[in-house]
Amino acid sequence: MEGLVVAAGGDVSLHNFSARLWEQLVHFHVMRLTDSLFLWVGATPHLRNLAVAMCSRYDSIPVSTSLLGDTSDTTSTGLAQRLARKTNKQVFVSYNLQNTDSNFALLVENRIKEEMEAFPEKF
């Protein structure tokens, strides 16, 4: 990306990838920071919702909340919780796909896991 400024210690990393899932092209944008991760998932350039999750020493389930958008749509918060548990980082997730089918969301999550296994340094 042109004009991208990365901190001297490599504290910021950007990673983009796409996948065709059920005939829909889905784009993924990952921004890895020192102790946190931002993940945007969508087909069009919109930020309709945003959730955050982080691990707590008081509970095995990461705490999460919706920061932006429809609070009844728990796709972002659920994904943020699972990624926070897996990475042990504070995770921000913006899931912006119209398809709310749970099987489709599982395909999206599996694609993210594949990318995490292939490029662990990006997460």
Swiss-Prot record:
Lineage: Eukaryota, Metazoa, Chordata, Craniata, Vertebrata
Role noted for this protein: Chaperone protein which promotes assembly of the 20S proteasome.
Disulphide-bridged cysteine pairs: none
Organism: Homo sapiens (Human)
InterPro entries: PAC4
GO CC field: cytosol; protein-containing complex
Protein name: Proteasome assembly chaperone 4
Top-level lineage group: Eukaryota
Signal sequence interval, chain numbering: none
